[in-house]
Amino acid sequence: MAGIVKNQGGLAFSGDNYKVVKEILDSGEKIPLHNHEGEDVVISVLKGKLEIHLNDDEIHTLVPGDIIGFEGKNLVKGTALEYTEFNETLIKK
């Protein structure tokens, strides 16, 4: 089989230079402040509404279909404003 379908939370796929993680958050659940030094980050919201804070001075409210990308050296934290599912792709530099 050429394709693999995954729809559960957690690590979905990984390779030498990337990881794709599906995150599932309940309403009000927080993503603690952190960074991904040495990687680029791409977040794609599938369901719900996610508020992302970058470096404590930039706020983005993401809804299904929205994609945000940023360098992993930036500090990031977030809050699910409702039940939310999103894919996070980490790409090594």
Language-model segments: residues:
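Short histidine-centered beta-strand/loop micro-motifs
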Residues: 31-36, 54, 79-80
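A short beta-loop-beta micro-motif enriched in histidine and acidic residues
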Residues: 16-18, 28-41
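Ligand-binding loop in jelly-roll beta-barrel domains
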Residues: 72-93
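Short acidic-glycine-tyrosine-enriched beta hairpin
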Residues: 56-73
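A short, N-terminal "cap"/entry segment at the start of jelly-roll beta-barrel domains
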Residues: 1-21, 32
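Glycine- and acidic-residue-biased ligand/ion/polar-headgroup-sensing regions
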Residues: 38-50, 55
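A cytosolic small-molecule/anion-sensing beta-strand core signal
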Residues: 46-47, 63, 82
